[in-house]
Amino acid sequence: MERYGISVQLKHIPVLDPEFMPMLQFNRAFLETATVPVSLAVERADGQVAATHTKIHGTPEMAEADRYYIDRLVKTELWMKGGYKIYINNKELYDYLKSEYCAEGGRAFDWEFMADVFEKPFEVVYTENIPETLDKPQPMGGHLDGCRIGFDAGGSDRKVSAVIDGETVFSEEVVWLPKINPDPEYHYEGIVSALKAAAAHMPRVDAVGVSSAGIYINNRTMKASLFLKVPKDLYEEKVKDIFIRAIRDTFGDVPYAVANDGDVSALAGTMSLGDNNVLGIAMGTSEAVGYVDANGQITGWLNELAFVPVDANPNAMVDEWSGDIGCGVKYFCQDGVNKLAPRAGIELDESASPAEKLKVTQKLMEQDDPRAAKVYESIGVYLGHTLAYYYEKYGFRYVLLLGRVMSGKGGDLLLATCRKVLDEEYPEHADKIQLKLPDEKFRRVGQSMAAASLPKSK
């Protein structure tokens, strides 16, 4: 199998996607023949930096491969860790990245998205002085003392818990429709209503923790699908500080923390496992990811792995939102199942929703249909190759696999296939990675209780 003059040999190929080329295998083969040093760095909030020192070929015949390798590397760093400024010490690659990361370039989506998230113009900088890596992880979570509120803001329901010294004394779920509502007062009132409902069951409120889908920097809502329909001017004015305002208006000056729901899932994993260094991957509507490091801290990385490239196949499926190809969202969520099902001979109603399409394959899998088995085996191969790639970036000990794609017999087959690929393709990593499905203890902790543990009380 060859891409851009780089040849890769695989033991495990997805039966329904024979052109799949794992990013890690491409990178390894590329670096075997690369000899010219190049350094780059991506800067994000609070002066944090992710630096990479690597090599390229630097020859005219390998120029396309060099550009592709650097493009995928920068994209990975941007969506894994976040950033608004790229530093690079190679003039040709600087010119290339500058032409891509602009309003008219191939990475216009990433350029605009990151500028919005970090509230700074996106820049590409040529320099010989590449800044070194600097992380400022936040100690967050695992605090169960006192009277706490945990709020989990979902896209179709919101859940709140009142927790006293680690015991949940009240919990409620309320259906709401945040994604279709353009008025941020609707969201604000829903949040305050939930907070007050929990507070009524405790003598006082010592701390409030919030879990929600989206990107949160310093507790501020920088991007979130809950507020999809809110106009941009109102978003700036009313949404970015919405959780902070709701908590302060209701309880005054209490400690609070707002975190991405993926990070809170990983935190719930650490609480149920009694150990740290957990990557949580929820395969549902999208690929939602969170990470708690070896010290039990949330890293401040974006962990938006749905946008991280996993496949070097130039004909990989396009993600409609970002316009890019070969990224996690088309492999590790219901889109991945629905992409492969027709290739296995499973007929799907094109007018059905993605969730309804997924149910067709799941139902066939429960009946041991061999077509459905091919779908889950193929995703298991994707995942085995990709977890080895993620491992080299994170160094996690546990992977917690969540979401509707992982449920039932399909999830079991996916997991077994993934384990086999790790064992046979990546023996140097396999014994260091423990794959986990959510157990009863994890469900007992739950998202809202883990959220309640986020802030340290006074």
Question: Where do the PLM segments sit?
Answer:
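Short glycine-aspartate micro-motif
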Residues: 85-87, 146-152, 205-209, 278-282, ...
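Phosphate/ATP-binding catalytic cores across multiple sugar-kinase/actin-like superfamilies
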Residues: 378-396, 454
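Glycine-rich phosphate-binding loop and adjoining helix at the ATP-binding site
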Residues: 58-71, 75-81, 92, 96-127, ...
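Short glycine-rich phosphate-binding loop at a beta-alpha junction
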Residues: 80-90, 204-213, 394-405
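C-terminal region/appendage detector
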Residues: 1-88, 107, 111, 205, ...
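Short, well-ordered amphipathic alpha-helical segments that serve as non-catalytic structural scaffolds
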Residues: 185-201, 382, 386
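Glycine/GP-enriched mid-protein hinge/lid loop-to-helix segment characteristic of carbohydrate kinases
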Residues: 1-52, 65, 106-108, 134-140, ...
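Structured, charged N-terminal subsegments at the starts of enzyme catalytic cores
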Residues: 143-147, 153-173, 181-184, 188-192
